[in-house]
Amino acid sequence: MADLSSLKDLGTSSEAAAPAHVRKVDSLGRSYATGKRKDAVARVWVKAGSGKIIVNGKDFTAYFARPVLQMILRQPIVAAARDGQFDIIATVAGGGLSGQAGAVRHGLSKALTYFEPGLRSVLKKGGFLTRDSRVVERKKYGKAKARRSFQFSKR
């Protein structure tokens, strides 16, 4: 019976398995995360500030000229109701503009959860923390494209 009492002291397995989300910030008060989308990879730093967003050394409105891409980039901040509270610096490489905007959005969402773990449930519910795994399907031999066949002539 002494063995059973020592087992009760350990607690249930669910208590031990639940990870506590801890704030991850470097010595300069920034949180860092990487985001990916298609062929693009973004490195994102988030710190408390006035709401500046810089992508590859330019203001995000200059780098992503299309309003749709700017909206994609700002979605996590708007969903978390933290507009104008963070300075965001991102470097992104590879892919096209749409993939790069998605990569920065993914990295920004992860960095926000590291900076402020309480935002995790809101961002998870919005689907911002999930890596979008859709990539271009490869071309197959005997086909014109990935699925399109060559033109067929009956006669």
From Swiss-Prot:
PANTHER family given in the database record: RIBOSOMAL PROTEIN S9, SMALL RIBOSOMAL SUBUNIT PROTEIN US9M
Name of the protein in question: Small ribosomal subunit protein uS9
InterPro entries: Ribosomal_Su5_D2-typ_SF, Ribosomal_uS9, Ribosomal_uS9_bac/plastid, Ribosomal_uS9_CS, Ribsml_uS5_D2-typ_fold_subgr
SUPFAM superfamilies (UniProt xref): Ribosomal protein S5 domain 2-like (SSF54211)
Keywords in alphabetical order: Ribonucleoprotein, Ribosomal protein
CC annotations in GO: cytosolic small ribosomal subunit
GO MF terms, alphabetically ordered: RNA binding; structural constituent of ribosome
GO biological process: translation
Keyword Endoplasmic reticulum: no
Domain of life, per lineage: Bacteria
One Pfam family recorded for the sequence: Ribosomal_S9
Similarity-based family: Belongs to the universal ribosomal protein uS9 family.
